[in-house]
UniProtKB/Swiss-Prot annotation:
Keyword Cell membrane appears in the UniProt entry: no
An annotated Gene Ontology molecular function: aspartic-type endopeptidase activity
Active site: D69, D300
Protein localization: Secreted
Alphabetical list of InterPro entries matching this protein: Aspartic_peptidase_A1, Pepsin-like_dom, PEPTIDASE_A1, Peptidase_aspartic_dom_sf
Predominant location: secreted
Name used for this protein in its record: Secreted aspartic protease LUC8
Domain Peptidase A1: 51-435
Family matches, as Gene3D superfamilies: Acid Proteases
Pfam families: Asp
E.C. no: 3.4.23.-
Function: Secreted aspartic protease; part of the gene cluster that mediates the biosynthesis of the mycotoxin lucilactaene and the lucilactaene-related compound NG-391 that act as cell cycle inhibitors with potent growth inhibitory activity against malarial parasites, moderate growth inhibitory activity against cancer cells, and no activity against bacteria and fungi. Within the cluster, LUC7 and LUC8 encode proteins which are not commonly involved in the biosynthesis of secondary metabolites and are not essential for lucilactaene biosynthesis.
Similarity remark: Belongs to the peptidase A1 family.
Amino acid sequence: MMHAFHHLAVLLIGSLPASASTLPHPDGYRHVNGSCSKSVAVPAVWNGFGYLFNITVGTPPQELTMLSDWTWMSLFVRSGRCLNQYDPSLCLGTSGQTWFDERASTSFANTSLPQLSWPLTAFAPNFTVDYGTDDVCIGDLCSAGTVLQVSDFPYPGEGIPKVPFSGIFGMAPVTAGLNETFHPANYQAWKAGRLGSRVGWNSCAALASSDPCLGGEAKLVFGGTDSSLYDDDTLRIYEIQNPDWLSDAFYPLTPPRENYWTTPLTGSWILGTSEEESRNFAVPFSGSNGSNVTPLAVLDEGSEGLGAPLSLNAYNWLVDQVRGTLASNDTIEEIHAQGSSGFNTAEQNWYTVSCDDIDSYPELVYELNGHTNYTVPPQDYVTKLSDSSTCYLNINLWKYGRTEDGNAKVALLGLAFLKRLYVVLDFETQSFGLAPLSM
């Protein structure tokens, strides 16, 4: 997510994996056979921030590495603007940050859309963007006049850490009443008849090779899906729900936003080590009018979604089941340095467990919208520290949306949950689909 940039950059600069700077060659783009001919598949690689892939913007085209973000609202590019002026030396500093040069593009134009600013984000205070238009290409599928966000921070760029991407490819759903400032690039391309309405996604983390990801670690299909990776009969569709309370429960941006890929979380169980099943930890909470409100599950494929999601009560129950040991400060530092857990999972304890007993640990079971269960095996929520023989519980205890009695209003469905599933985001029906990956 975009609001996590600053915090993540401070922790990760200098320790990014090699894949962060190496994307498969653009020849890896390919069209996908399916119901819609207007689709293109792109490989993506993982780093400490999330999945990265390449697009081009402008005329002549400038190749930019994008951070995939299902929770952000638009296509954002780092620019040579700040303090309401164009001055790359002032606004980018000397870090070597890659960026989009609007003045090198003959097709770039400013818009009359208002400048927007978010006073409070984890990236930086007063995160400010202008809106322009330009040609955007995903592979060889291009869409002219795409509305995009252009950075215009109210301070020089020297103090902003360098990140290994030039912008954010937001893919949040466009719900009723949202204007062009909330329109992702692929949504605009669909509306213009350049792409289909769907985006397909899969990780190769649980697959035998990277071939289904075109040599990357994940694959995005803009305008369609890769039907060879799932059985359509097993695809379960969930219409999104974006109530007003979601903004504060998920991430309290100012001004608030509620347009996310969500569905009711109606069940959260832990199958105990002695075949004992826990109680249901997806507990309704009291709404503003006193009625019971069902928690929501939020899709988040980025760094903030790392780890299996649990409430505090569920986490404590799991720790008892696996006889977890409170991690030392040194181990916690190793966990953060490795980048295998969400960096906004603050205010939670970390626990180490025996690496030899993983197969005997319980499964985590999640029920979405009252009718489909999904299982996360222990191999996907127990993580080994790369430089030691230590294993730890990789649990996402999201710091927002917690209730005083240890329950949670939201659960982030990230890589631990999604790695064995095919994901379909549908901008036309405002729904998403999940199906088991064909292994």
